[in-house]
Amino acid sequence: MADYLAGFYPEWVDKEENPRQIILDLGKMITNRIPVKLGFQKLNKYDPEYWGLAALLTDEQAEVALKMGVRKPKTMADMVKLTGKSEEELEKILGDMSFMGILEYNWENPTRTKQWVLPMFVPGSAEFTNMNDTILKKYPEMGRFFERMSRLPLEKVTPMVPPGGAGIGMHVIPVEKAIETENQSISVEHISHWLDKYEGKYAASPCSCRKSRLTFDEGCADDPEGWCVAVGDMADYVVETGKGGRYITKEEALEIFRKGEENGFVHQITNIDGADKIFAICNCNINVCYALRTSQLFNTPNLSRSAYVARVEKGDCVACGKCVEVCPAGAVKLGQKLCTKDGKQVEYPKHPLPSEMKWGPHMWDENYRDNNRINCYDTGTAPCKTACPAHIAVQGYLKMAAQGRYTEALALIKKDNPLPAICGRICNRRCEDACTRGSIDQAIAIDEVKKFIAQQDLDAETRYIPKKVVPSLNGSFSEKVAIIGAGPAGLSCAFYLAEKGYSPVIFEKNEKPGGMLRYGIPSFKLEKDVIDAEIDIIKAMGVEIKCGIEVGKDVTLDELRAQGYKAFYIAIGCQGGRKAGIPGEDAEGVMTAVDFLRTVGADESYPVTGKAVVVGGGNVAIDVARAAQRCGAESVAMFCLEPRDKMPASEEEIAEALEEDVTIDCGWGPKEILTENGRVTGIVFKRCVSVWDKDGKFAPAYDENDTKTVPCDRVFLSIGQSILWGDLLKGSKVELGRGNGAVADSLTYQTAEPDIFVGGDVYTGPKFAIDAIAAGREGAISIHRFVQPHSSLTIGRNRREFIALDKDNIKVEQYDNASRQIPGTRKDVDHKKSFRDAKLPFTEEQVKAETARCLGCGASVVDPNKCIGCGVCTTKCEFGAIKLHRERPECSNMIPSEKKLPYVLGNGAKQALKIKFSKKKEQ
């Protein structure tokens, strides 16, 4: 992938016939591009050094700057002598140039006399111009100017940069808590050292990288204000010259750093003045930061890395993946800790370094922001996390439960699933299907453990309400978001938006929220108080739910837009049933499964008399059959197309139905419903000879002559669901596709109407609650990025793609068999007739026994060649499994920028010799 941002210049440049020589001269003086500096390359009007300065400076201002020299402080007396201008003239010129960001000033001399400095472009004037809203609004090209000047000077030198960064740009400083116990640490490695050094002189100022990226629609959706903490005289400069600075206390600075760590931001300090001076401590987002880009794009970690390397204690790691999600360098990925069949540990590759081989553009990674979000190695990781649509940290919460850390376990689950008590009762348990333990005896009862953990949410005293983690120092976002539908996808989207600092409003057409959780799943599987408890938590997070409002009928999308809503998440599910298209299906006594379950969900006393027939073989059909039994049916018989071993319903669901005296007859499809006086009297089935065609597509074939007539009084059709749009999309650009579902981008869920996103069954067709929950989380991410103007919906986004380890290549002989725990049943409930849930949660003893069966398949693996020693990973680990170690003390060698050339060239020569002799040895 080439440099896709290359070649930009403002439109006005083409119209300028004669470039201003004084600007070309100034650009050459300031730039750090070596070919330009040495005269091998001449600047022209299309170079950023030219148009970036030409946009702002008059010839008079440029002449003053040329006389100052780069990074050579000048007092007013010096400036008068240099320019021959009066103090009054210079006050205006220097003031204007300081406001623009072309000059900075300080009082760093023995007499504390104010002095002006012409800084380098980066770090320097490129940042300062982007911090000034007035300048950036008038000259948006300055955003691209900063982007270019943070890259072009480095392209030729990056492979040669020695540890410590050689006074180039910025430098990672680790999370202080991560190195508190490191006895060998030195002062410059501690944020507290720099705060103490500049005691009382701090200012919170905007992040110039975040603001720059916004000018070309590559924002990261963070609020850019306040993340850069200026220290010393720079604090005065950013406050006094329109750079958005505000004075803060030391405590406020520490709070900014804490919030930065919560958000996974990397601390960096300026690194151009040696070990005795910095002027800013930044909290950097890898998706926009140009300083971090220097190491990540060029694959040259010396430009960023601290003296520390993260290491994982495999025995303590549970492969939750939270360190992986925040690692800015993609240095941590999920792997496995189980041995392969030959008894060996899996060996993981290390990233090549410029000290090991010839470097160049072929080794760069233009797509580093996406590639650094790859979650696991190709050899795979824990199958449970991989198989779960929400990719919950199963291994992690099992370990926490084993340790009795139940609240922490619940918190860990809610990072990926806001409805664990619900899912603990109704999930289709793909994690258990994939569980490695199943290769030995039986899979871990993962969902039962989750159900036990989530019982805390059913009690207001013990429920867990997540803390908000907001990428804004304001603590919240004001943009209004409407969610249409209070089912699992809508609730999940609302939860994660609230956690991010929004106050979304859910519009639900039914009387109560929950969607198909409430109106499509019988209470003997999912009690209503469980639904209510988890929804109450979402409300407590600041989500408003307006029931009894049908969008499209009671209020339109355009009316909501007029009320200030900036984005919409449509998650109305598949609320309609499907009929079979056969004679008699409109007779009295025929209902679709969806209609029947909705009726029973609202009124459990609804009567079903006589003989009932259920057409269908999925889990919904099982729910209908069992509900019909409880509603008083004389008998219930199920008929389905599939053979017994191919039924869509789970084995557990089928077993429960059979135990409740439901009969199941396989291999039949409906042909006709018999009626008398408009009412059902029976149903005729025809033999299904095949369900799928040779390509595996659903295409049932029948023997029309082989029929069966079944007398009955009620027929329930459980053969599919449909989407009931009503007038919701009236006047919108949303396109509909297969099954009348919304067409949307598969990553962002954005539709053809940019402010409308979709998720859950309305996009995928009928699936499971956990699929909708996973979609809701992704919808929240997209909406957050969308409503923050000029942000990218995709750059640096975690695709949530995982690979399961090879269970056939695991050494399992070392493990003893251990029986799976079975939950108890309530003695006070007739499990065949009652609508109450008869299943008990595990006891604490059962949880201990069951979690002990976990093999602990996965673990995080650090590539030390990619690690930049920021310590962000340590802030996310709940097990103390990943720690920083001071293995690269040379990376704390800070030198002034003016001395960089000997260090860079010396290291380059040293590397070249090493590579040369390495090749000779190989030969």
What is each PLM-predicted segment?
Residues 85, 116, 268-281, 297-326, ...:
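Ferredoxin-like iron-sulfur electron-transfer modules
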Residues 329-383, 398, 444-480, 499, ...:
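Flanking helices and flexible, charged tails adjoining ferredoxin-like Fe-S electron-transfer domains
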Residues 98-109, 332-333, 882:
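A short, conserved structural fragment
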Residues 112-151:
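Short, amphipathic alpha-helical interaction segments positioned at domain boundaries
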Residues 392-395, 401-402, 443-447, 483-551, ...:
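Beta1-alpha1 glycine-rich phosphate/pyrophosphate-binding loop at the start
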Residues 624, 762-787:
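A conserved FAD-binding loop/helix module that cradles the flavin
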Residues 453-475, 500, 533-554, 577-631, ...:
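Glycine-rich dinucleotide-binding loop and its adjacent helix/turn
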